[in-house]
Amino acid sequence: MLSAEELDKVEAQKKTAEDLAFFTIGYEGITPENYLNKLIINNVKLLCDVRKNPISMKYGFSKNQLKNACESININYIHIPELGINSEKRSDLNTMNDYKRLFDEYEKTTLVENVDQLERILNLAHKYQRIAITCFEKEPRICHRSRVADSLKKLPAWDIEQRNL
């Protein structure tokens, strides 16, 4: 996706910090190149895809395309479908109240039923030091990844700085 020259330019901007960090990132409204640049600049070592179905109409963001792109720039990729939301539940979201209702239900069901996956992310964060979770929406408050991030903060052993890219 990136030429050697483009990759060198992005690498030059890369954060040298190796401290523990956790990011959330959405790909809505940006190109695959811009998305990958954000990961490189923030020295992300592992991308966790929390979409239920990692298929995208947007070029570069379906599971295999994204996995291959990440691996080509030495970023590991894993898919954690257990933390996704079924697409039929997302079909009638028109207001912020609709999103809030959906995410409140998600928090009470999916996240409670999948604490093992949250603990898995915690363990991966300690292993890789700098990780990100990803989904589609640009704005975290209208994406379930914000609820995943909030639930991670509640884990007793969670002591990691979080920010949205």
How would you label these PLM feature ranges?
Residues 1-165:
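Residues lining hydrophobic/aromatic ligand-binding pockets adjacent to catalytic sites
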